[in-house]
Each structure stands twice: as structure tokens, then as C-alpha cells.
Amino acid sequence: MLLTKRFSKLFKLTFIVLILCGLFVITNKYMDENTSVKEYKEYLDRYVQSYSNKYSSSSDAASADDSTPLRDNDEAGNEKLKSFYNNVFNFLMVDSPKGSTAKQYNEACLLKGDIGDRPDHYKDLYKLSAKELSKCLELSPDEVASLTKSHKDYVEHIATLVSPKGTYKGSGIATVGGGKFSLMAFLIIKTLRNMGTTLPVEVLIPPGDEGETEFCNKILPKYNSKCIYVSDILPRETIEKFVFKGYQFKSLALIASSFENLLLLDADNFPIKPLDNIFNEEPYVSTGLVMWPDFWRRTTHPLYYDIAGIAVDKKKRVRNSRDDITPPAVYTKDLKDLSDVPLSDLDGTIPDVSTESGQLMINKTKHLATALLSLFYNVNGPTWYYPIFSQKAAGEGDKETFIAAANFYGLSFYQVRTRTGVEGYHDEDGFHGVAMLQHDFVQDYGRYLNAMESIGNKYGGTKSADAIKFDKNYSLEKYTEEFFDNEDLNAKNHVDVMFIHSNFPKFDPYDLSKSNFLTTNGKPARSYTALKKVKNYDIELENFKVLNEYVCVNKNPFKYLDDLLGQDKTEWKRVCGYITDRLAFLESTHDKAIAGK
């Protein structure tokens, strides 16, 4: 079929060339003397080239062409881009499954709480088997049939598309703004510049939050940053047909951003290492997709693989959670009985552990198909795919959509092995986590290569597969601690923190001032108390410096605060009073915080 299509297009191209050559011979006699033959030949070459481009095709939705970039006021190029994504969204409208899951769970479901990847949860791993996971979210045969058809139709439809030439170029960072998230995005940008990162930043302003003129036109350009909009890639009439919300904006930021190499960040996620060279580092260069882990094991419904048409070999174990290096015979008593083995350890499945998508690195040339399928999962996430992927697990949302899409296409990716860290504070009620700590993927990959070499030497060489036996002394925890996790900052296998995902509370001065959240026994308290973990970067102090300077001293207008406070001088005084008091407290306690006191 593909050969026939190509022959047809070649025939059309040859035919049009013959016609144009004929026109050239005829019109050459009558051409204006001011038009040279060279100029006419150049025009002919351009026309033939444009026709060739128009009818060039690929069965791979992720194919990319090498042509002139289409952004930066290239009106014709932008129209091509809008046409491409208009087709994508038309397919989304036609192919999305109808209705929604009732989110009813079978009484036999054993998922009564989140299952982590620490030793105290190992006793619960049988609950993650295909047999047990299939007893949770209830999906009827008709629903499965409908989901299967819609998934197949969408995949087939986007496979017919060829992205416009130069759709994405360069490298940079994107996040989602709008409302309070624009203010938080600005805090991220200031952190990036504090760290010496010079990569450009794009902030997606959702359709309902447009109008941040001062922020977009005056503040951001000073920091090599700018606002982008859904209307950059979609016609207005298409936008009006969709209701976007929540996690779906991240998928939109991914495709709307102009960068080929993209770091997609949540607006409350602060990079605390220089990032300018991250796109030149392994494993990003070879895979084009790097993700980070969550705290929890994967709980994807087995029926997802049926819906997506993914073959799962239930007789072949290929890993033990994050350990995909040690031979399965070492940690599996009976390779012929995998009935209690976690589903995600089987060949063909999405690997453990679950994904935390507060940061994502993606090459959109290599992984355009991943981006487009994850868009489908996110558009249909609240109705179907979020519960199918997570089944009541914490953080249900877009987090599994990117890795699932890459896994579907068999595209390469790397998920960081180092466990997610936690930062927070203690009070009379116990420990309160305020941030997730995600680690340096380059260092992590170096530890992974060390693990491959060490384990390869132990089990490789002259040993046959039959000679490798079950080892009762094997431990996933030992594997993890030996090669990746070590709280000793000076240990050879220590991996630096790269991102502080400050998920609760967020650095929103209005909410913080209203709740008086960061107090203990009526006194101000620090929420980040282990600064050595983060190379002594005092994130609270630095962010409140920015808030004080831009909100209270310079009075830069942020639409979120302007809409909330308006002309109410009393409210402005209260909010800025909180900011200045908090800043004074953080400055006075900085040295003690660095010392760990």
C-alpha cells in the first residue's frame, strides 16, 4: 500500500514537471525581457520542490522534515502548523471514546491504599499482579470494545499525518501559566537565571487566562522568556470546540512550544542546577525522552494493554521493578509461575515505578508520535485513561500518559532510577512534606551504567542462562542502595537533586497570607529544613525576595493578584505585610538553616 502511494505521488510529480517544462518552452518566447532564464528556473525549482513537499508522505506520525523553521512571524508556516494540528484535533473529536467510566471499583479489589517501592510494601506486591489488578476498576465488554476501536482509529489517523517542515527547532523550557501559575512560572524563571541557566522559556497562557499584557510583553522578555498560546497552533474555531482544563494544559504546552528539545516543567517545579547542557547529555541524546519516578508502584489496569493492542508476554518476566539488569532467574523462584508477579515486570508492559511528570525532557522530532498519543490520553484522561492508568493511586492525572504513549510505539526512553526524595518540616503533628526532590538524570544514568557493568561481570561471561540460579540473598533494596540511593552527600553513588517540586504549599503569597500556613505554635516556621539535600539553595528565601521586589516594591502588575485584590489598599497592605514579614524571618534564619539547626 505504501509503495503504491509513493508510486502515485512520483507519477504526479513527474507529470507536473513535464507540464511545467512545456510551459517553460512556450512562455520563454514571450517572457518579459526583465525576467532572466535563471530567475525563471529558480521559480520552477521552487515550485517543483513545494509540490514534492506537499505530496511527500510517511507512515510514521513521528517523522520530521529538515526545512526552514515555521515560527517567528512566518505567517505561511504558522498556517501550515495550524492546519496540521487542526487535523489532529479533528481526529480527537472524531475518535475520542464517548461517555466516561463510572469509576466503580469491584469489592474484590485489593488496592486499599497506595503501594510504594520501599521494603515495607514488598509484602503487598502480589496485589499488583495481572490477576489482582483486573479486579479493580470495572470496565464492561462494550466499554472495552469502544475504547479499543477509538484507540485504533486515532492511531491510524495520526499515522497519515506528516508534520510541517521545521515545526520545532532549538532547545528550551516550557511551563503552563495563567492565573496564579503565571506568578509561580516567574519564580521558576528567576530560579533558572539564578542558577546560570540561559535557555529560553515559554509560558503557555490557557485560553481562559489570556490578557496578561504586562507579564507577557514587559516582564518576561527581560529574562529571555515569552508567552505562547493555544491559538499559536490551533484556529480559534477549533479551540472553541474543546474545553481544556487541569493536566490537559501540559499536553498543550508540549505541542504549542516551539522547541524541538523541550524540558516541560510544572509551574511549581524549581531547577536548582544549571541546565544549559542537559540536551547534550546521555541518556537524553540516545533516547529523546527522560522521565522521573513517583513514590508508588504502577497500578495500570491489565485491560489497557488489550485496548491499545499491546502484546504482553505473561510467561516472560524482564525486570524486578527498577532493576532491569539482574537476570530474572536470580529473584524469581519459579519462572514458570508468574501469577503473583507484578504486571509491570512482564515483557511488553510499562515498567515500574510509576512516573512523576512534574518534569519531562522530550525530543519532539523523535517523539512526535509520543506527544500526539499522550495528547489523546490526556484529552480523554478525566473520562477514561487517568483511572485506567492509575486505579485510585495517588496523583492520578497526566503522569502516566507520556510513558504509556512511548511504550505503545516501542520508542526508547529512560526513567531515572534514583528514588524521589522528600523535603519538609516537623511540628507537634509530625512530619509535613512540602516538596518532592528529583535527581540529576546524568549522574543517575552513570550509576545505571556502573550497575550494568558490575552485574554483567557477576552473571555474564562464560555463565549460561541455565547456570544462573535463584539467589535468596538478592534484594531489590540492596540493589537500589548499592547503585543509586545514598543519603551520604559524599558517597560515590550519591546523586544530586536537580528539581525541587514544591507541590504543597505553593509559593502563592495570597493563599499563604490568608491561611497563615507556615507557622508552628503561632510562630513562623521554615518549611524547608534540610537545605544540605539541595546544595544549600534556600528556595524559600530566594522566592520571597522575588515576591517582595516585584509585587510589593516595584508593584509589577500580575493579573492574578490584581483580579483578587483590585484597588483594595487594605488587602494589598495585608498581603505585602505578610511577604515582608516572611522575608525578614527567612533572612534572619538563613545561616541556621544552612547549618542544619
UniProtKB/Swiss-Prot annotation:
Residues on Cytoplasmic side: 1-12
Keyword Transferase attributed: yes
Primary residence: Golgi
Pathway membership: Protein modification; protein glycosylation
Membrane topology: Single-pass type II membrane protein
Extracellular side: 29-597
Superkingdom assignment: Eukaryota
Family, per entry: Belongs to the MNN1/MNT family.
Function as written in the Swiss-Prot or TrEMBL entry: Alpha-1,2-mannosyltransferase, responsible for addition of the first alpha-1,2-linked mannose to form the branches on the mannan backbone of oligosaccharides.
Protein name: Alpha-1,2-mannosyltransferase MNN2
Annotated organism of origin: Saccharomyces cerevisiae (strain ATCC 204508 / S288c) (Baker's yeast)
Gene name as annotated: MNN2
